[in-house]
Amino acid sequence: ASYSNASASDVSTAIDAALAAKPAWESLPFADRAAIFLKAADLIAGKYRYEIMAATMLGQGKNAWQAEIDSAAELVDFLRFNVQFAEELYAQQPQHNSPGVWNRVEYRPLEGFVYAVTPFNFTAIAGNLPGAPALMGNVVVWKPSDSAIASNWLLYNILLEAGLPKNVIQFVPGNPEEVTKVVLEHKQLAALHYTGSTAVFRKLYGAIATGVAEGRYQGYPRIVGETGGKNFHLIHSSADIENAAIQTVRGAFEYQGQKCSATSRAYIPKSVWPQFKEKLVKETSALSLGVPTDHKNFVGPVIHAGSFNKLSGVIDAAQNDSELELLVGGKHDNSTGYFIHPTIYATTNPRHKLLSTELFGPILTVHVYDDTASPAEAYADVCKLIDSTSEYGLTGSVFAADRAAVRFAEDALRNSAGNFYINCKSTGAVVGQQPFGGARASGTNDKAGGMNFMSRFVSARSIKEEFSPTTKVEYPSNEV
């Protein structure tokens, strides 16, 4: 299969077509818009379940389990729960009306169009970024990742089959910079909805800010973004060591660590390090690596040559780093695919760059903290270390049976992770259960998978109506 990249002229045409479709789409009753997305959810859950899973496996390198929980389960959850969240938002109305007065709030679609830029690593996110704004009555220009075209194109056609008018969401693959340049120059840009790298998001944020300063736009475009993470597992001496080690292996190496929430740094107390290390290395060494179509494989290839080159470069450089001890892995092979073996390093340097730099691959770095002399002080210090080591604030986990230790970490790390997990891995947020997003360099923390997220794609209008006429100009205080 092949596809064509959009030219600058194509992008302009797509924007014009979307804006032309806007009046009819936003005037359609919510129930009718919702029915389209609910039907799409049913089509994905049934008729197209295995086809969209296969497209995700073959195009994005996910094994069957990862494809199922993403392109089938989570995508369907987004489509269904977003309808519920929208209904909850619309129900937010003034609680008090004065005698003879009726107050109400209208949640209008944004004035203009939404630009959705989606990543390769989740078909569900690729559906949610254009889908959520469209559900709220917006029109969307959707630039998919060029590493996820197969699943994204299938999803787009499923939406059309479900009844989505063809111009409401414009599917516009192309060179990211060329497509974005046209979009950001358009006066009617109403919002950016983005998931991807921190560096690109910062660039887009700055470009939109420049446009605002120049008076380029008709308003102030909303910016909703979720980017990277340097997500942690903190182990307390009271933790269930087997559970903590297994959860760490899953968090670090499922889908080759190509999740913004993937576990990429772990902090282990010296008092339990021998047991933890033994289990960690044993479980990691046992992971099967190979093509996603062989269901026994836990680990598949990374997404493309650029990712392979970056990650293999990290592994090669680590061979000459005296501050790193290789515990397992450290191998890479691109002879039949872009394979990076699950790799774990231990470092004595609490500020090593591998503890602060997002790698987006199957590389975990461990720091052992000394809790033998003063356990409580060591635990407090490592919490400060975790909070200050990375610029990100996406996900993190604490493993402890001691409830005081859990409470301490929950408070000390309250700004270190937008999604904080207790005795479970740093990945796997479920729509409707754990709204997802982080702050600091990780994004705007608007929490996809919750009602507040939907509010980012509407512009509220307060309406007051009086039923009784006013009969005099003067107020009571004017009467003497």
Model-derived segments and spans:
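Conserved C-terminal structural/oligomerization subdomain of aldehyde/semialdehyde dehydrogenase
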Residues: 1-16, 20, 26-38, 48, ...
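Residue-level signal for inorganic ion chemistry
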Residues: 3, 18, 33, 56, ...
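Active-site proximal loops enriched in glycine and acidic residues that flank catalytic Cys/His/Asp
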Residues: 3-7, 54, 60, 68-71, ...
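Hydrophobic face of alpha-helices
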Residues: 8, 12-15, 34-41, 49, ...
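Long amphipathic alpha-helix in the N-terminal Rossmann-like dinucleotide-binding domain
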Residues: 8-19, 34-50, 61-91, 100-104
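Conserved helix-loop functional segments at active or binding sites
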Residues: 20-27, 42-46, 50, 54, ...
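Rossmann-like NAD(P) dinucleotide-binding subdomain of oxidoreductase/dehydrogenase enzymes
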Residues: 57, 86-243, 296, 376, ...
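ALDH superfamily catalytic-core signature
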Residues: 158, 163, 185, 191, ...
